[in-house]
Each structure stands twice: as structure tokens, then as C-alpha cells.
């Protein structure tokens, strides 16, 4: 059996997820090996899934991907000749230390849903609450809904307070979810793949919150056997919210000028 120290080394990722530098560089016969440049080159040569599995200790089930990146819609810019019907956001707050607070922001044109921004951060609530408030103000969001899990009620109230203190008014409410998370994600997946548009990968930086959000979304499997599902779950909550608003009700939530 591996000792705990050996086990930690065995699980260590080739590139540090924060610094993007090699965790394994050393000198062999006067030559540096397993350098940052080497691992970054491998990352360019392999698919994201292969690299994550082989070098970053993140195995996945390729055949069971629910949101395969090749099946999603992407955009470079919003439609220039149309005014959106509304701009909304849905927040899924972290329930445990390793979870991420996930809040996608959607600009809606008819049935088309453009995910223009996200808060996706595993930092504590005192960090993510101001992040959410700033994101909602910046994107001129008309209304935001937070899942009323253990702390969601208080979280939403605090975000609303921060926004009010900065002189803005955004409709914020909480909503309790009773459906099974995995079922909810599966049910929403068809509409997400058909009508949701995500920022093209060339338009944001590797390691950004949007990048981490998309990475978690596109490696989620149908079996649900993944370390985290905050990104797909927040999108499923958003899809559900949009369905509730549709049918002539969207104009009620026109964004503030």
C-alpha cells in the first residue's frame, strides 16, 4: 500500500491548477525534464479530456459526457441589431468547503439564451457575495434568483444589501428546489444544448472563472459520478427559471435602464 506521502505525490497534478507551473520539474544528466513548457506543449497536443485524465489526475467517462463541448453553441458577440428581452441570473451557493458558488448571467433574446458572464468561485461567502453583487451590477441584470439551500436565504439577502448600498436596485429572490439534482440536470440538458450560447473559448483566459465553469460543465457525466456539479446544476436551475418566465411573462422582468 502507498504511504500517505507517496499517495499525495501520486495524486499531484502535472501543472499546478493555480500557477499553471510544473509540479515535477527536476534535472537529469544536466537537463531539465518535466518542465512547465513540456506539460503545456502536451496540453496543446492532446484533447482537454485526455490531458486532464493523463496529466492532471482527473479521470472522466468520455462516452458519458452530457455536455460534450462539440455539441454546445458558441458566440463571439451579442446580436448587434436586437434589444434583449431581459437579463437574468441564477445563483447556486456553495454548500460545502469544496463546492463552488456558481452564478451564470443570461442575456435573453426570444428563445436564445446567451451566457455572458459567470461567478464561479470556491472562495468563502465573504468573497463571493461582493463578487456576485459586482457581476449583477456590471451586467445590468434585471432579476436574480438564488437557490434557497442551507444558507441561500441569507446569502441572497446579503448580496441585495451590497447592491442597495451601492445605489442600485435589482430584483433578488430565493427559490427552494425539491427535484433531484441529477434528474434536474438531465431534464434541462436538451434545452441547454439547443438554445444556450456560450462564449467562444478564444474569448476568455485559461484559468478564468468562465474557463473553470466551462471545464466543469463539459466534463460532467450522465452518471453524475464527478467530484463537482455546481456548473451544470446552476445552468439547470437557470433553464428552469427561464421556462417559468416564458409564455409572455418575460417582459415583466425588463432590465433597468
Task: Identify the meaning behind each predicted range.
Residues 1-10:
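Single conserved hydrophobic/aromatic residue that forms the stacking wall/gate
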Residues 14-16:
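Conserved AAA+ ATPase "SRH/arginine-finger" region at the nucleotide-binding site
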Residues 18-91:
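ATPase catalytic-site recognition across NTP-hydrolyzing enzymes
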Residues 49, 53, 57-58, 97, ...:
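C-terminal nuclease/phosphodiesterase catalytic domains that cleave nucleic-acid phosphodiester bonds
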Residues 73, 80-81, 105-146:
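Nucleic-acid-processing active sites and adjacent nucleic-acid-binding tracks
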Residues 82-108:
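Gly/Thr-rich phosphate-binding beta-strand-loop-beta motif of the actin/hexokinase/Hsp70
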Residues 95, 120, 150:
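Short, glycine/acidic-enriched loop or turn micro-motifs at the edges of active sites
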Residues 142-156:
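Extended C-terminal subregions enriched in glycine
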Amino acid at each position: 500500500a502507498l504511504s500517505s506521502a507517496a499517495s499525495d505525490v501520486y495524486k499531484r497534478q502535472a501543472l499546478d491548477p493555480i500557477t499553471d507551473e510544473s509540479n515535477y520539474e527536476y534535472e537529469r544528466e544536466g537537463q531539465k525534464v518535466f518542465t512547465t513548457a513540456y506539460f503545456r506543449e502536451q496540453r496543446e497536443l492532446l484533447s482537454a479530456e485526455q490531458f486532464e485524465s493523463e496529466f492532471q489526475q482527473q479521470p472522466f467517462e468520455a462516452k458519458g459526457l452530457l455536455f460534450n463541448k462539440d455539441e454546445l453553441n458558441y458566440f463571439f458577440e451579442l446580436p448587434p441589431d436586437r434589444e434583449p428581452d431581459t437579463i437574468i441570473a441564477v445563483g447556486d451557493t456553495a454548500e460545502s468547503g469544496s463546492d463552488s458558488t456558481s452564478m451564470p448571467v443570461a442575456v435573453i433574446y426570444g428563445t436564445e439564451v446567451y451566457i455572458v458572464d459567470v461567478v464561479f468561485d470556491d472562495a468563502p461567502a465573504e468573497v463571493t457575495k461582493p463578487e456576485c453583487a459586482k457581476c449583477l451590477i456590471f451586467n445590468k441584470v434585471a432579476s436574480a434568483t438564488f437557490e434557497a439551500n442551507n444558507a441561500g436565504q441569507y446569502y441572497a439577502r446579503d448580496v441585495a444589501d451590497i447592491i442597495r448600498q451601492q445605489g442600485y436596485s435589482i430584483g433578488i429572490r430565493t427559490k427552494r428546489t425539491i427535484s433531484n439534482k441529477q434528474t434536474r440536470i438531465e431534464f434541462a440538458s436538451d434545452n441547454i444544448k439547443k438554445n444556450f450560447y456560450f462564449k467562444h473559448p478564444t474569448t476568455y483566459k485559461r484559468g478564468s472563472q468562465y474557463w473553470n465553469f466551462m471545464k466543469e460543465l463539459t466534463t460532467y457525466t450522465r452518471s453524475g459520478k464527478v467530484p463537482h456539479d455546481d456548473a451544470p446544476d446552476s445552468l439547470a436551475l437557470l433553464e428552469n427559471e427561464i421556462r417559468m418566465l416564458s409564455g409572455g411573462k418575460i417582459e415583466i422582468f425588463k432590465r433597468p435602464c
